[in-house]
Structure formats: C-alpha cells, structure tokens
Amino acid sequence: MHHRSYARPMPRYRRWFVPGGTYFFTANLARRDSSLLVDEIAALRAAYAEAAERQPFETIAICVLPNHLHCIWTLPEGDADFSGRWRRIKTGFSRRLPRESDPVPGRRAGERGIWQRRFWEHVITDADDLAAHIEYVHANPVKHRLVADIDDWPFSSWHRWRRSNLPGEVPG
C-alpha cells in the first residue's frame, strides 16, 4: 500500500535585494544571555565604522542592546550588498575581542561563535514603514525592560534624532 505524504518541504529563505534600498536589520549574538555588544561598545563602533568606510552606507537609525542590535540603512544607488557589510561588521567586532569572550561550543573550525550565523532583514517599502521601524528601533530598550524611558538608553541614535532628526553613527 502506498502512503501519500502531505508534508510540505521546508521553505527556503529568500532575501530581497533592492539596489540602493533602505533596509531594517536585526543581528543577534549567539548567546542570548550575553551583554558583549554593550560591554564592548568601542569594539562594535570600530568594526561598524570600518565596514562603513570600506562599503559605504547611511545609518538612518540604530540601537545596540546587550545581545542584539537593530538598525536601518540606506545603501548607495545600484548597491544591494548588505550581506558583505554585515560580514565585515561581525568579523571586525569578533576580531577585536579577547579570545575568551563568550565562546560558543560546537562551532566550525575557525569560527568564534560570537554571532548567530544569519541576520534578519526587511526592505522598507514606504515612508510609513520607515517611520514605524525607526520607532521600533528606538523603543527597543523599553520593550526589553532595560530602561523605563528611551532617553535613558545610551546606545541609540534616539538622542541624535531627538535633537536634530538626522541619521547617526553607532551610538554609545
């Protein structure tokens, strides 16, 4: 007797590449209990600045939390290589840390295991979508109960937005 399978194959995740587009990103550390991103904010700032120098992008908004970060970038016209930029940021940050920083067992040879291997991205579709994501980025420390008021979180472009509504660098 033949049994028909109704199981569906796992969908393959597909990235939507829009040259010159504006994107919302979330990048997570491998360990959810880690606070490396804020403990080592100088290393993150240096890696972020180096990546932006080598492959320019405009940071619209950013918020660094202990174990993940959210940001919104606009890429140069004709450029959709956000993956290369994230590779530079993650590698640059990891290389700046002491060897014993938050190791994750079970990684491939040569991998530090500081970051989750992937990141999440969303293409910003219009002005309302952009405004909603900027608000989400800046409100994240309150959402995670790290502070009661957005003004109290130092690792956010919120402070620059509040003063001038201009895009910022890595906060801290």
Regions found by a protein language model. Name each.
Residues 1-172:
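Short catalytic/metal-binding and nucleic-acid-binding patches
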